[in-house]
Amino acid sequence: MARVILRCMNTSQLMTPARPGLADLLGGIREQTRRGLDPRRTALAVADVLRAGMPGPDLLTDEERRGDADELVSHLLHAEPAFSVKALIWQPGQLTSIHDHIAWCAFGVIQGVEYETLYRDDGDHLTEIGRVANEVGDVSGFAPPGDIHRVHNTGDVTAISLHVYGADLSADGISVRREYDLPIRTVRSKR
């Protein structure tokens, strides 16, 4: 069984449900979450809404877009019982721990490039199963189980992504991430 460490990343408690540029997106997300779909289908439906109405970096203030050189910063932009919206600010070189989620998620890149390494839980170890470069405009949706990954900004500019989680993250200390501390194996192709 995987050894899992629960941890919460730094989150600014910014609640602005009527933030300019977000109202239409919130309405579309709300409509999808009310359909009663299973988590995977909800994540994919919300990803479609995000793809169609992805805001630009100007959704955030100049100060919010700066981030922090010492740690990944997230800004909680909206929360309600069915979902929350966060903006993540990735300075060059910043990366997450290897983690998965306890709720569905959809995300889109609005600035820069985020490199994602995907893993499979094989009990006593994780196996790397793929790598993806998510560029501006790229959107993805996923739900547990099987969403183990690590995200890294390997570029030389700040990356910004918008994340929609199927949980209310407004309570202090709430996180949708589970971190993994297991040996990693890479699948090698046969020649």
Residue ranges of model-derived segments:
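Asparagine-centered strand-capping/turn motif at beta-strand->loop junctions
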Residues: 151-155
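Domain-scale activation on soluble regions of proteins
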Residues: 164, 171-179, 183-191
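A short glycine-rich, His/Asp/Glu-containing loop-to-beta-strand
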Residues: 62-92, 139
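A short hydrophobic beta-strand segment most commonly corresponding to one strand
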Residues: 106-108, 156-172
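Conserved short histidine dyad/triad with adjacent acidic residue
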Residues: 86-100, 144-146
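N-terminal leader/capping segments at the start of a protein or of a new domain
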Residues: 1-56
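Glycine- and acidic-residue-biased ligand/ion/polar-headgroup-sensing regions
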Residues: 103-120
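Short acidic-glycine-tyrosine-enriched beta hairpin
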Residues: 121-148
